[in-house]
Amino acid sequence: RQVQGIFDDQEPETRSYWNYPDTGFWDPERNTREFVAAMSEWREHGLLAITLNLQGGNPRGYSRDQPWYNSAFGTNGSLRVEYLGRLARILDRADELGMAVVLGFFYFGQDERLRDEAAVLEASDRATEWLLEQGYSHVLIEVNNECDVPRYEHEILRPHRVHELIQRVRDLSAETLLIGTSYGGGSVPGENVVRASDFLLLHGNGVSDPERIAAMVRRTRQVPGYRPMPILFNEDDHFDFDQPRNNMRAAIGEYASWGYFDPGANNYQEGYQCPPVNWGINTERKRAFFHQVRELTGASGREAVIHP
């Protein structure tokens, strides 16, 4: 989970929270530049996919209030050109490296920045159209992050209606994009989402027992409407990579992919979510994760396919 690759903060009162320690100010272009520079090392370890979100994730990791303003959309659903520029650099590099990107559209800490449901629909349409115009074929759409979190202000982003948005993106893309949504830690997708989705996204936050992770995958396959499709944990804040049984191995043992969520501490060292982020493999926890990825994938360190 590296959703802050295009992060910025348009709120003057909080922008200084993310200042780099060496310069004393926040720089969104530097953030993306360093993200892109780190991608080949991730790929060399066998990593095949990353996650981004057009409204990011919580830059504090976990907090009740989210006063910052990080959104690739204007209040009316228009697209912000500067965000698209940063996004294109990451998507282009991922394509060069043979990596997929799970791209989220909306996040519950920022969806209120869109003034009404019409703006949400406009934002979704414009983001989808932009992806189609660019011709990207390695991007999967997560229409929103954790649709069952009660903080969503727009009904169409909540569990009982989010399938409508999934179908809207599918129709607009003429079924050329793969689309789904994710649920909060420990939750299993609802039937309406299972029937509408091309792949299913689970979260392991709050699930400390690897056996529960395995059970979540099995339960998901029992939801009415399920047919063979990829199941992916794109967020889990449990590690234990030195243990023979951990959440990552439990998910993979059920033929589900697993996503590493390491929030960090806004110190340009720890984690991959709280800015300013050091996107390198620079801590013991990051090294432990990537070591396990390399072990499980059999990567030799020469897998990156880099085109001129």
List PLM regions with ranges.
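Intrinsically disordered, low-complexity regions
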Residues: 6, 25, 75-78, 260, ...
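Extracellular glycoside hydrolase catalytic/binding regions
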Residues: 122-123, 138-140, 144-291
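Active-site mouth of glycoside hydrolases
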Residues: 1-199, 203
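Generic hydrophobic, helix-prone segments enriched in Leu/Val/Ile
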Residues: 31-35, 103-105, 127, 213-220, ...
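Carbohydrate-binding surfaces of carbohydrate-active enzymes
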Residues: 285-308
